């Protein structure tokens, strides 16, 4: 599965490690320093995005992902 990570703190890194161990591909990593990457072809190619930020940022992140037809959990 192609996965985009939204939030790359301690939990984001842990999710990346587990996903890779299980044979998934990380196609995009979005963090506060590269919000513009929501518009990248790599992000749009994801089968799913895993959002692990904070409640304040989460809603906007969901909207950005949905704008590219990427499902979010």
Regions found by a protein language model. Give the residues of each.
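A structural micro-motif
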Residues: 1, 24-25, 70
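Glycine-rich adenosine-cofactor-binding loop
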Residues: 2-15
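Short, hydrophobic beta-strand segments that form beta-sheet elements in well-ordered domains
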Residues: 5, 25-32, 49-52
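Short beta->alpha connector loops
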Residues: 9, 34, 53-56
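NAD(P)-binding Rossmann-fold cofactor-contacting core
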Residues: 14, 18-39
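Rossmann-fold NAD(P) dinucleotide-binding segment
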Residues: 40-48, 52-73
């Amino acid at each position: 599965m192609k996965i985009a990570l939204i939030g790359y703190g301690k939990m984001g890194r842990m999710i990346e490690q587990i996903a890779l161990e299980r044979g998934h591909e990380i196609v995009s990593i979005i963090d506060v320093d590269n919000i513009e990457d929501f518009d990248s072809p790599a992000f749009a190619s994801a089968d799913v995005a895993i959002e692990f930020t904070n409640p304040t940022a989460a809603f906007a992140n969901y909207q950005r992902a949905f704008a590219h037809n990427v499902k979010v959990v």
